[in-house]
Structure formats: C-alpha cells, structure tokens
Amino acid sequence: MLTDRKFVVKTTLDLQDDISSVCCSPCNRYIIIASGNNCQHIYYLCATNLEILFKFKAHDDSIVHLVSTLDGKYIVSSGLDGLIKIWNFKTANLANVLPKRDVRRMKFDVMENMWLDIAESIDISFDEIWQS
C-alpha cells in the first residue's frame, strides 16, 4: 500500500527561490534543479534524501532548460543569456560553451546519436558540440 509509512518519506527542500527547470540523471539517483536569484544556479540533489551535492552559478541570466545526456556524463543548460553550457556531471565543472543562440528547448535523441533540438530548428550533432 502506497500510504504505508515505510514507503512514504516526507522531505522538504527550502530553495527560497523559483525553480525554472528540473531534470533527473538517467540512473534516477540525482535530481538537477535550476533555481536561485533569477534562476541562475544549478543544484545537484541526491534523489533519496534531497541532500545538496553541488550548487553553483551557471549562467548570467535565468536558466530556461536543463537536460542530462543519456550516458549521464554531462548536464546541458541553456539560459536567457543565450548560451548553451555543458557541465561535467561528476565534477560540476564547465566542459564547453556553445555560441549564443535563442534556445527555448533542448532534447537528446537516442536514434540520431545525440543532438540538440533548439528553437531555430537547427540540429547540432554531439560531435559539433566538442568542435566549437
């Protein structure tokens, strides 16, 4: 029964700011949240107890989207500053920055290797990300 106490854990996380985007790691062990003043920060949380593992300023303006790569190695963020940033998942270090674009959505597609679908309907292959 779902209401049984051993299955229900009530946990609250007080970020004190709006949340603009949320994604989960492919293994579902981590939750990644964009929040903070003007939603510029990224928080890595442990999914089991919501412990904050990392918190860092990611963009100069609000983050509009977060996505995890399918292999779980990277988190990709897009912000109103027009940048797409690629973060090493394990270290939270910045791995790469793509040139400014008007990004409203992002996704990774398994069938097409990996690519980002951005607002301008330009497909960027994963190889192109590392060449920029």
UniProtKB/Swiss-Prot annotation:
The residue spans of each WD repeat are 14-53, 58-97
The reply on keyword ATP-binding is no
The UniProt keywords, alphabetically, are: Repeat, WD repeat
- Coiled-coil spans are none
SUPFAM superfamilies per the UniProt record, alphabetical:
WD40 repeat-like
Do you know which PROSITE patterns this protein is assigned to?
WD_REPEATS_1, WD_REPEATS_2, WD_REPEATS_REGION
Q: What is this protein's name?
A: Uncharacterized WD repeat-containing protein L84
* Gene source species: Acanthamoeba polyphaga mimivirus
